[in-house]
Amino acid sequence: MQQQQQQQQHLHQQQFSTPQKQATNFFQQGIEHGPTPVTDFNYTPSHQRPYIQPTSGTVVSSHQDLRQIVETTLGSKGVLNQAVKLPKGENIDEWIAVHCVDFYNQINMLYGSITEFCSPQTCPRMIATNEYEYLWNVHPGKPPVSLPAPKYVDYLMKWCQQQFDDENYFPSKPGVPFPKDFKDNIARPILKRLFRVYAHIYCHHFNEILELNLQTVLNTSFRHVCLFSEEFHILKTNDYGPLLELVTEFKDR
């Protein structure tokens, strides 16, 4: 718990102006034709059985089944709202944990596609708009510091991987329970920080996303995070920053 608190980032916020109005325009490009399948891009099935066709109340019993549900439900138009719902009889913490890893892989892939455009020279600070700068606690016990966006994302991805590898946070053995505070003190900080990468991409690299024809993938992935967070009350309104209006648009679809 102490280590978790020491690693807590601080969001430096100045007076909020009108960055949401620009963000809403992103919604009109890519998502309106229906979602492109978004999956855990580093995931390879370990056996050769047909994918589960999930429906409301599908009963699952393993990490493998959970991952298959996440993947297959995203492949059909209009099912994101259903895809985030907890399958019947499944452990809520395990369901959230699987999605944390999947969202990590999605944003890792998306950011990886624009790294040549995001450098210490082009993005000397990790910001969404000028009103929102995200700081990182490089040295525990000392104030968080401003970093170039690529360095911030590098620290973030390594930190996430450390969380996933920690058996105290993400137990991998059957029957080992998740911490009682898993959703609020472990999952929420992970999703909150990953959300900041979406914010940086939307506010500073959306033109590159358009050039790469990845706008549908980005919008679908982002909407998936928003719907999942809303379903399980993970992120709070102030976590959305300059993308609050865009989040509202996606939720209402």
What are these regions (language model features)?
Residues 66, 70, 107-110, 114, ...:
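Generic structural signal of hydrophobic/aromatic residues within well-ordered alpha-helices
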Residues 108-185, 191-195, 200:
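Amphipathic alpha-helical interface segments within eukaryotic helical scaffold
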Residues 214-253:
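Eukaryote-biased recognition of C-terminal alpha-helical segments
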Residues 1-143:
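The feature captures two recurrent sequence modes
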Residues 182-190, 199, 205-221:
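Domain-level detector for trafficking modules
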